[in-house]
Structure formats: C-alpha cells, structure tokens
Amino acid sequence: MLVSIEWLYNNLKDVKVVEIDYNPQISYYEGHIPGAVLINWRDFLSDNSRDFASPEKLSKVLGNAGINNDDLIVLYSDMNNRYAFYAYWILKAYGHSNLAILNGGIYKWLRENYPIDNDAVVVRRSEYKASKPDWSSRILVWELLSRLKEIVLIDSRSKEEYDGLTTAPPEHKCEQTQMSGHIPGAKNVPWTTLLNDDETMKSRDELGRIFSWLNREDRIVVYCRTGARASVVWYALKEVLGFRLVRLYDGSWVEYGNMVGVPVEKSISDHS
C-alpha cells in the first residue's frame, strides 16, 4: 500500500499515477511525476453541501482522469503528501481497493532527482463506476458527541492547535474557528511525528512504539482540522498497524470549533 520511489519509477507504465492537489496551480504545473494526472482535492467534494461527492460525480471525475475500476492507482499530493492519504481513505470508501500511496510523495521524488514533467498529461476518458460509499470508517459529529466516553480520541493537529494557542495551522492561517482547544479527552499525536525527515512514513515498529498506549479493542476516532492530516494517522493505525476499530471524524475542528454548546478543553488559560 506504500510504494517506494524506485518501485514507481520502474512501474510507471503499469499504474495510474494521480497527483491530488490543494493548490493545483502551485504544485502540478511547476513539475509533476511523468504520466501523473491531476485531480483537484475539491473534486472529491459535493457541489451542494459540505460533504463528499456523489458516486455519479466521483465516477465522472475519475473517468475524466482516464482511470478504470481495475487500475492500480498510486497517489501522491502537495502539502506534505497529506491529501494522498485523504484521497486513499475516500476512494477506498467508494469501492476502489486497488490503491497505493507514494511513500515520501513528490518531495522525495524531487530530492532523489527523478525526472519531472511540466505539461498536463493528455488522457483518454474512461467509463468509471464508483460504488455507493461504505462509511464504516467515518464518524459524524452527532454520533461522536453521544460516544465521547466510549471512544479513544486522537487529535492529530499541531501541539499549538491542540493546546488552544491558535485555531488554525500556519498554512491555513486565514481559516480561523470561533473556538480554540480540543475535544475533551483527546490525546495529541501530531501527524508529523509519524513521518521521517524525507516525508516517508516511519516503520511499523516505530509506529507501534508511538501508539503503544492503545489497546486492540479500543474504538479509536482520529481528527484534525478538516480530516486530511488525520487520514495519515488513520492509515498508520488501520493499514499499517492493523487496528480494526478506527474511524475518521472528517468534520474535525473546522466543524467542532464552530459549534455552539459543545464541550471544549484547552491546555492553556484563556484570558480573553
């Protein structure tokens, strides 16, 4: 599920490489992996509500990218590869199981001096058929609030966000919430602690030590600001370490930190 830079380079003709970008004009057109098609992160979202796309819309998005249902999709992204993990979580829910993530993403690809292209890839449209999503790995705020005492919460944001020093990370500093802090009982495991300096994911043994405080029977919920960073933690727990009961709260702090009447904890005093 995590493929190396070398493996991808040797298998470029046999897979569909997809770059998932938050800022496509900044990332993809400045240089991308040869043959990689671009999918804007927002294409996974619904046009009519704050939710994910319908199967019909997702089918069109993937079909326009020339992807077939049986293709092996290798994902990478900008923003420290976080949206590759988020896309993995979404696509798996919609029934595409033949998925992999480029370990280290575009950063490691460039760092090791592999070739890049600057022009958009011309693709032949395919007829993709997305399934009705299986959201068993997702939790909505209503259920979350009713189960706060039953679940193990992991906040994967930075310590500054978790403590309540800021309501948004530096890369999204204009997108503040009304409240700072964290969901009561949540333990802070910043997503970056799961990655090496070259942005590859740490080994199974290292991840096991990071999460040694968890029990296999725990019902785990991970969250961050919008779900992207939390998807890295979800992947490590579910796909690498094999925890069965892991769900992602994609509403995350953008939703929770703007809700009226919900409980909030802070690790600092609020003098406002």
Annotate each language-model stretch with its function.
Residues M1-S27, N103-Q178, V264-S272:
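Flexible, polar/low-complexity N-terminal or interdomain linker segments that lie immediately upstream
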Residues I39-W41:
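N-terminal, Lys/Arg-enriched amphipathic/low-complexity engagement segments
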Residues D43-I73, K187-I220:
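Helix-loop module immediately N-terminal to the HCX5R catalytic loop
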Residues A53-L148, L165-T166, G181, R229-S252:
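Thiolate-centered catalytic microenvironments shared by cysteine-dependent enzyme domains
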Residues L153, R157-I210:
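A mid-sequence, solvent-exposed acidic-amphipathic segment
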Residues C224:
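Short cysteine clusters
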Residues R244-S272:
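Extended hydrophobic/aromatic segments used for targeting, binding, or gating
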